[in-house]
Structures are given as structure tokens and as C-alpha cells.
């Protein structure tokens, strides 16, 4: 039911963009923008207005765009099936991302499978997220989720590379509380 409603709303927006393009002889489009700062601001405002609603305003952030929530455990195939139909409607920009575990640099088939999902589900743009750690003292690298101590030299000077909000970052020190909460809620798509 939520999927049908979401597609109906975004289809209406797409129709209006097409109508305005014809009427004004300018390009109008629908963009599935992340609006990262708003995901936390809107929950705060909505909680003040509507109170705490389980599964909605009780979180510190809203899932942005038309993504499956980051904490929803599902396969990449299921995620693509849900999110793919929106890509044709949001031609101004969109992204499909998949969280994978393990070391993607040594698993090209996992990447190829995700590219096949993109093709099958008419997905225009994708990111594959996975952990990448590097010891800043000896150069050891791996893809463990919570590496704190280098197994080679014992150093705690570990650079943790992650993709957040479209950027590869080694630290989350400057991210707002909503983005940090979202990051901690992320699950691997298996």
C-alpha cells in the first residue's frame, strides 16, 4: 500500500514537471534529492506537532528520498525492486545504494550482480557501500566492520573509510546527529 501511494505521489509530481516544461518551454524535472539536513529537522518539528509516533517520529531522522529505510533487512534484489520504479520518475537525479559486507575489492562478482540488478530494474545510478580500513602506521588494510586495533602492528591509529551522504569520509566528527543515527542503523543487504 505504501509503495502504491509513493509511486502515485511521485508520478503526479512527474506529470506536473512535464506539464510545466510544455507550458513554459523550459526544462522541469523531479529530483530524488537526499536533503540530508532536513531528515533530522523534520522529525523534530513533526514530533512537536504530532507527538511521538512509533516507527515514524520516534526516530531522530526520516529516511530520505524514496529509499528503503537503512535499518530494513532485505536483499539487494528486493531493495532494487522497491526503489527501481522511482528512478524513471525522478530523471533529474536519483541513487540506488547497496550496503555489502566483506571486501568488495576481492569480490568483483558481487559488483557485477548489483550492476545486473540495476539493468533489470531500470536503475540509473548506484553506489556500493562497504567498509574500508587502513592502519595509518603500517598500511594494513581490510574491510572489517569494527576494526579498532591493527592485527599487524597493534596500532589504534585506524582510518575508517565509509560513504555517507555521497561522500567518502574517514571520520564522522562533523556529521549531524540525524546522519550519525542513520549510520548506526545501517544494515547489510544480503
Where are these regions (language model features)?
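Long, C-terminal-biased catalytic regions of enzyme "large/alpha" subunits
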Residues: 1-190
Amino acid at each position: 500500500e505504501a509503495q502504491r501511494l509513493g509511486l502515485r505521489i511521485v508520478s503526479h509530481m512527474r506529470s506536473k514537471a512535464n506539464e510545466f516544461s510544455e507550458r513554459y518551454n523550459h526544462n522541469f524535472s523531479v529530483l530524488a534529492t537526499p536533503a540530508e539536513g532536513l531528515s533530522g529537522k523534520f522529525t523534530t518539528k513533526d514530533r512537536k506537532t504530532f507527538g511521538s509516533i512509533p516507527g515514524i517520529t520516534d526516530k531522530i531522522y526520516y529516511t530520505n528520498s524514496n529509499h528503503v529505510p537503512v535499518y530494513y533487512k532485505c536483499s539487494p534484489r528486493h531493495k532494487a525492486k522497491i526503489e527501481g520504479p522511482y528512478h524513471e520518475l525522478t530523471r533529474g537525479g536519483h541513487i540506488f545504494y547497496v550496503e555489502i559486507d566483506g571486501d568488495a575489492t576481492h569480490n568483483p562478482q558481487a559488483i557485477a550482480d548489483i550492476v545486473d540488478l540495476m539493468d533489470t530494474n531500470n536503475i540509473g545510478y548506484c553506489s556500493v557501500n562497504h567498509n574500508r580500513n587502513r592502519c595509518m602506521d603500517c598500511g594494513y588494510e581490510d574491510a572489517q566492520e569494527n576494526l579498532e586495533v591493527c592485527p599487524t602492528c597493534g596500532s589504534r591509529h585506524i582510518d575508517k573509510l565509509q560513504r555517507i551522504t555521497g561522500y567518502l569520509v574517514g571520520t564522522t566528527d562533523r556529521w549531524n546527529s540525524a546522519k550519525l543515527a542513520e549510520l548506526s542503523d545501517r544494515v547489510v543487504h544480503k
